[in-house]
Amino acid sequence: MANSPSAKKRAIQAEKRRSHNASLRSMVRTYIKNVVKAIDAKDLDKARAAYTAAVPVIDRMADKGIIHKNKAARHKSRLNGHIKALGEAAAA
């Protein structure tokens, strides 16, 4: 455990940041999960709406450094690809 007052303060701040960042990561996963559920249910409109809601959240968390920018891009790309495939299957 930290001995000096400044080290104790830094430990407290680090714990606060850790729990807040965990909450934000959980929120991103929930938004992604909502898109995946809509895709699995083959509900194109709901999937598009969920994706539209998820993209700004994913981008914001990437800007804040909660998730890596490449991971954010990968999630958006894959989700959008699944939605496009769902739309093409519905059109055919």
Curated annotation (Swiss-Prot):
GO cellular component: cytosol; small ribosomal subunit
Keyword set, alphabetical order: Ribonucleoprotein, Ribosomal protein, RNA-binding, rRNA-binding
One Pfam family linked to the record: Ribosomal_S20p
Superkingdom of origin: Bacteria
Region entry Disordered, spans: 1-23
Biological process annotations from GO: translation
Molecular-function annotations in GO: small ribosomal subunit rRNA binding; structural constituent of ribosome
The protein's role, per its UniProt record: Binds directly to 16S ribosomal RNA.
Family: Belongs to the bacterial ribosomal protein bS20 family.
Stored PANTHER family: 30S RIBOSOMAL PROTEIN S20, SMALL RIBOSOMAL SUBUNIT PROTEIN BS20C
Protein name: Small ribosomal subunit protein bS20
Organism: Stutzerimonas stutzeri (strain A1501) (Pseudomonas stutzeri)
Gene expressing this chain: rpsT
